[in-house]
Amino acid sequence: VNPFRASMILGTPGSGKSYAVVNNYIKQAIEKSYALYIYDFKFDDLSVIAYNHLIKYRHRYKIPPKFYVINFDNPRKSHRCNPLAPELMTDISDAYESSYTIMLNLNKSWVQKQGDFFVESPIVLFTAIIWFLKIYEGGKFCTFPHAIELLNKRYEDVFTILTSYPDLENYLSPFIDAWKGGASEQLQGQIASAKIPLSRLISPQLYWVMSGSDFTLDINNPKEPKVLCVGNNPDRISIYGAALGLYNSRIVKLINKKKQLKSCVIIDELPTIFFKGLDNLIATARSNKVAVVLGFQDFSQLKRDYGDKEAAVIMSTVGNVFSGQVVGETAKTLSERFGKILQKRESMSINRNDTSTSINTQLDSLIPASKISTLSQGMFVGAVADNFGETIEQKIFHAQIVVCLLYTSPSPRDS
């Protein structure tokens, strides 16, 4: 099975997708010396598995990776990392991407309204603030907390400072025109649409974690491999999700490069976070040895939070599919993906004089939607992708995934 063609794990709550598939992806990735990035929605469920397995198998790496955790709930047990580090941004488009990611994670309804005036305005304004911090005194204050604090100053003072830089004067021309033209109500509405969502992120914990630099986000750097776990909290999804989305977008750009270690990106409960660039990562990361694993409950969740177009791209470009029980349109879509099979049907008719038998053939679904919607816990259907020269004849499966709970000692050759 080729993991670099991306994997999708679906199933309703309790179907066993994390226990049977996601957990084993983590274990096998570590056993095969991958650099690892894990989005742990219910922290620390996946992080504990990764940490314990890394201790057991770290000898398999040429350079043992370091284990890092980002945990906003308990900063004392979290490492610090600045996702807006100035060295990561070479152009104002990098600042725009960061601003875009934050805003869409804070306002998921904006995903469907990209390009609208009151969507683009706050993104452009926050972009200018990030880029100012990047070019001011060599990026000394270029952190996410500094950007939020600067945004919340009086807009007259902020615009006076920003427009003193030629790089930003033209970029902010719509705001400056409104300011000088006396359209204060419109201007205040534009600024408020940036301030109000970002004010939810004003937190000592977030500020502390996102202003330090204990490590860099290039997890598959051959000289400094890493296993990075970022933890969310189901009770604070809307707050932590925006901050973690910024880490995600940075990591996607840094790991999808040539001459790096093979790596694995595991995103459990994908719809809880807006992962900018995910469709492009799936489509292009195979040649750079990046395995992407996405766990979510069904396609309707994905369409709701990512929009129809991006969800369709993600669903159609993933090569490996593992599905527990799903219902409705998701079950129908999977049934169509698995294809049809030619089956013989025999019918018999009986009347007073004789009995006749007829045999015909008909194309039926290989795995009907009705069967997918009634799968028991631990039972999965799916399709796998193979490699050139390593053909898998039976790509479609319907089986129980058996998880081995016994600890197997490393073989002597691994010591």
Describe each PLM feature range.
Residues 297:
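Conserved H-loop
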Residues 292-294:
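Long, positively charged, glycine-interspersed low-complexity recognition regions
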Residues 3-290, 306, 371-392, 406, ...:
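P-loop NTPase motor domains
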